[in-house]
């Protein structure tokens, strides 16, 4: 069964928080989209799915580079076949 790692781009606080506009924060949108995508993929029964953030307040890494490195290392350690990184703009 293919393994799909879904990276909900950005952190909720501190550094690497993403874009903001129209009353929305990128990290909140990517978190919600990632959770919904994971639900749909799991429901199909055809994929194993892992999310980069399991709670909306989870912060990964301690710098921009550290955050990205942690996400990639987690996906590779898990043996992901696919890495989907979610981002938004406007």
Residue locations for each model-derived region?
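Catalytic-core regions of hydrolytic enzymes
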Residues: 2-90
